[in-house]
């Protein structure tokens, strides 16, 4: 190794504590900024190039660097995303935070070869701008450049598998294996694209559902987890809950109503309109049940599940579900229990004389 390379190694040794601290701090800061941007990433990894690795690099091309600050990959950070679309979003965050050395940054996605799936990473060479952070005692913090690689989980897995198999190592491998690896690369790229496409379509579907719910076109909205969550945001059971609470001037305690979704599906409701029709047609019956159940008590706190449960009770009784139907309802809402059978029998017996059962 020549004298110049040895001097660069000496500079590396003196800066190693700074490299190590930056490699720890920057990823943690990035995670915070990703959270603020609403970006969910799979992982943020980091490493500091070892002296042995740097020595090997200098042995090959030490004359390329006039100072240690010309070496841009001593600190390496890798941001692994779940979706292709998020790679560019991560890049946007980096562009806001750091000075990007565009001359040395590389978008390997634009150099697309038939077998290059795992190597489609976006690589930015970054530096901390003085306007964001500076320390007169450590001016090197604003001189050190570091590399940030951005890729998806599948691209990362592919790159690691290639490394393990020796593929891309410069050693010729039999064409049959090369062909199979290329086929796998294509399959993984399709999977990556499909994940992103499905996410975009789901986002579009959710926006459409929210618009339909807000406009009141509930009969056009299929009943599923997404649509039910949107439906609950308009608080469809509040009016009946307030009516029931007025029986005892009770306070309403909000509880999670998501467990009613499988019950509504078991009742063969297929759209949000089916739930809305139940509210319209059975609110009076549900109130009669509530008057009977709590009218003679001193309950002053009622769960917000009171209205939907009484609606389901009235619906099941009026449609001939009887004791079996009510037990299934209670099992779905509260979990299977022998006490549910007794409660179902009690509800059937006590409800038979209520006005709605005789109309």
Question: Where do the PLM segments sit?
Answer:
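Short acidic, glycine/proline-enriched loop segments that cap or flank alpha-helices
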Residues: 66-67, 134-136, 252-255, 299
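Sparse, context-dependent recognition of short Cys/His-centered cofactor- or disulfide-binding micro-motifs
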Residues: 11, 15, 19, 29, ...
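Short, charged low-complexity intrinsically disordered segments located at boundaries
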Residues: 55-64, 120-128, 216-228
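An acidic, glycine-/histidine-flanked metal-binding catalytic module
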Residues: 2-12, 16-18, 22, 142-286, ...
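Long beta-strand-rich cores associated with HINT superfamily self-processing modules
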Residues: 68, 80-197
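Charge-rich, low-complexity segments
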Residues: 1-74, 81, 85, 211-214, ...
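Amphipathic, soluble alpha/beta structural segments
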Residues: 113-137, 176-209, 288-334
């Amino acid at each position: 190794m020549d004298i110049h390379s040895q001097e660069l190694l000496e500079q590396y040794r003196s800066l190693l504590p700074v490299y190590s601290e930056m490699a720890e701090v920057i990823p943690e800061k990035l995670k915070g900024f990703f959270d603020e941007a609403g970006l969910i990433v799979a992982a943020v990894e980091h490493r500091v190039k070892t002296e042995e690795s740097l020595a090997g690099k200098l042995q090959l091309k030490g004359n390329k660097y006039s100072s240690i600050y010309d070496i841009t990959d001593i600190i390496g950070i890798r941001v692994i995303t779940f979706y292709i679309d998020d790679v560019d979003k991560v890049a946007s965050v980096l562009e806001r935070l750091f000075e990007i050395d565009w001359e040395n940054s590389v978008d390997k996605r634009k150099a697309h070869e038939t077998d290059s799936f795992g190597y489609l990473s976006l690589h930015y060479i970054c530096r901390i701008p003085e306007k964001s952070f500076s320390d007169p005692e450590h001016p090197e913090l604003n001189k050190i450049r570091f590399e940030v690689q951005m890729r998806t989980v599948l691209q990362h897995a592919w790159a690691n598998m290639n490394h393990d198999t020796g593929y891309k190592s410069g050693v010729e491998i039999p064409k049959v294996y090369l062909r199979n690896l290329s086929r796998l690369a294509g399959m993984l790229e399709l999977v990556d694209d499909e994940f992103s496409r499905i996410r975009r379509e789901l986002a579009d579907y959710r926006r459409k559902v929210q618009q339909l719910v807000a406009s009141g076109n509930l009969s056009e909205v299929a009943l599923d987890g997404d649509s039910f969550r949107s439906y609950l945001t308009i608080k469809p059971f509040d009016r009946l809950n307030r009516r029931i609470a007025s029986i005892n001037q009770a306070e309403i305690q909000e509880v999670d109503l998501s467990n009613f979704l499988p019950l509504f599906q078991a009742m063969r409701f297929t759209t949000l309109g089916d739930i809305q029709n139940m509210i319209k047609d059975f609110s009076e019956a549900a109130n009669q049940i509530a008057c009977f159940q709590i009218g003679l008590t001193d309950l002053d706190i009622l769960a917000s599940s009171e209205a939907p449960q009484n609606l389901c009770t009235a619906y099941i009784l009026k449609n001939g579900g009887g004791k079996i139907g009510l037990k299934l309802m209670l099992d779905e809402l509260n979990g299977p229990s022998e006490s549910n059978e007794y409660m179902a029998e009690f509800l059937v017996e006590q409800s038979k004389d209520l006005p709605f059962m005789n109309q």
